[in-house]
């Protein structure tokens, strides 16, 4: 019985950790979803549409970039900046010093804008949903994405 409990704890720990295999999978699937050019705009639109459908009040956090119209040039530029930052974080998952520097910078930017802690899990859920929809549910590993995205978001949210 003790062995079973220890095994269950190890499985739970491994699932919560962004392992090297998780990082490889997330990087590959992110590259597929992020793509280039208009693919990036489509991925961004999927993320923001999902986020705002689930958290309509979040639009107010983006008034500076015309958050009421995700198709506006101001919001599209913001969306591409967010995806660019996420792209750098995903690319740096296996380079801890670089990732930590990126996360520290993103943390200071988000702190100065007063982004509430409640918004981060919603963004993670929307980003994961958008990537899954883009790469296909059959090959998508939700545990890998959750563990690696939580590592990124915990660094941004402090």
Curated annotation (Swiss-Prot):
A cellular component term, taken from the record's GO annotations: hemoglobin complex
Gene Ontology MF terms in the entry: heme binding; iron ion binding; oxygen binding; oxygen carrier activity
This protein's UniProt keywords: Disulfide bond, Heme, Iron, Metal-binding, Oxygen transport, Secreted, Signal, Transport
Binding site for hydrogen sulfide: 89
Cross-referenced CDD domains: Mb-like
The keyword Cytoplasm is annotated on this UniProt entry: no
Disulfide pairings: 18-148
Residue ranges occupied by any Globin domain in the UniProt entry: 17-158
Entry superkingdom: Eukaryota
Residues binding heme b, per UniProt: 110
Gene3D superfamilies, per the entry: Globins
Function: The extracellular giant hemoglobin is able to bind and transport oxygen and hydrosulfide simultaneously and reversibly at two different sites.
Family per similarity comment: Belongs to the globin family.
Subunit description: The 400 kDa hemoglobin consists of a spherical 24-mer arranged as a double layer of dome-shaped dodecamers. Each dodecamer is composed of the 3-fold trimer of the tetramer A1-A2-B1-B2 having one intra-tetramer (A1-B2) disulfide bond and one inter-tetramer (B1-B2) disulfide bond per tetramer.
Protein's UniProt name: Extracellular giant hemoglobin major globin subunit A2
Species name: Oligobrachia mashikoi
Name of the gene this protein is made from: ghbA2
